[in-house]
Each structure stands twice: as C-alpha cells, then as structure tokens.
Amino acid sequence: MSTIKELYAYRQMIFSLVKKDLRGRYKGSVLGFLWTFINPLFQLIVYTIVFSKILRNDVDRYYLYLFVALIPWIFFSSSITVGAASIISQKDLVKKIYFPRMVIPISYVTSCFVNMLLCFIVIFAVIIVTGAGINFVAVLTLPIIMIVEYIFALGMAMIASAVTVYFRDLEHILGIVAMAWMYLTPVVYSKSIVPEKYLPLFNLNPMTHIIDCYRTVLYEKQVPDLTALLWAAGLGVFFLVFGAFVFNKLQRHFAEEL
C-alpha cells in the first residue's frame, strides 16, 4: 500500500516521462509521429500477403482478423523489450536523485499503451470503412481487456527491467523470446488449428486469452468469454504482484550496478 501511495505522489513524474518518451521516440525523423501508424500497418500488409495469399489462409476478412490482434501484441512485446532497457537508459536519473524506481518501467509501459490506443483509431477506421460492423455493447468491454493486458505487460516489464540491470544480455534475449512467444500465441493464425493435445499449454499463456477477447469483440462482434477474461486477469495480477516483488528486491543495488 505504501508503494502505491508513493507512486501516486510521483504521478507527475510518470506523466512527464511518458510525454518525453512519446516526443523523443521519432524525433528527427522525416515522418515523425506517423511512424506510430506506419510500423503496424507495414507488418499487417506483410502478414496478410504471406498468410492469406501465399499460405492460403481461408479466414474471412483476414486483414481485420489479424489487425485486431497484431496491435495489442505489438503493445505487449514492445512493453517487454523496451521496458527491459528502461532502467539502464535512465541510469543518470537513477544515480542522481531519489524517486521510486518503479516509476521508470511504469512510464515506458504507459507510453507503449498510449501508442496502442492511437493505433486503435486506425482499427476502428478500418472497421467502419470496410463495413465490418461494430457491436457497441461488446465494445464496452474493451477498456477491461486493455487494463488486463496493461497489468500483465507491466508485471513482465518490471521483472525484465530489474533483471537486465544485472544481466545485460537479457535485453537481446527478450527480442528472440518475444518473437517465439508471438508464434505461440494465436496472433497470425486461429487457435482452432492448434492440435487438441497442445491446447492446455496454449491456454496457460495469458496472451492467448487476451488476444481471443480482442478478436471476439472487434472481429466476431460479440461479448468476450468471461471465464477466459477472468483467467487472464488472474494471471495478470499474479505477474504484477510478482514483478513488483522482484523489482523491489533488486532495486536496492541499481545505482552500484549502473
């Protein structure tokens, strides 16, 4: 509880770091802020061509099926990979002044989250332009799904950022892990093609349920399965608590290691 109060007291610092990251992310580039939309759109085009044209995926409106899963996945993977280096990238700040170190991974994950929210504008534009339709009752559950994903991503980012201070290679390893994790999550394919004997393993992955919930709302236009959402939320809270525990244990010697 004391940690939450302290973080609340430093909320302005979190907002400032989020603004700084968003402004500095594409500083100096010609297209600047537009890269927020160009990167996921380019990935969407590549995956759509590969899976719907070359590999003959027969999913109806595959571009939409993929897009509503790809944007949340990019948020999650970016939170881990960018979050892993967050403490190291702010080492001067860590050495000079006191503040709750947890502020740093929180600000980086929040910055990635804001990027995802902006990309959702494009998702809704695609849905409207293509006439796919929207179930407004189902859309009301989107904030809950987003919060569940944010909690899980933050927990993982806390662990990654703290451990990376002591083991710098983790930052590079996580890039490989994120790529493998994506293919173990039904982002570019349907869970229905997974052999039944492997389904229990897939269902242990919180991102499987989170991606399913996004698809149920935005692609199938239905209210998501409450059981799946609760399972993902439970795992998300577990990793958040565990991540905070690991972070608090390791943060004591950040300054010396940096």
Predicted stretch roles:
Residues 1-258:
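Hydrophobic transmembrane alpha-helices and immediately adjacent juxtamembrane helices
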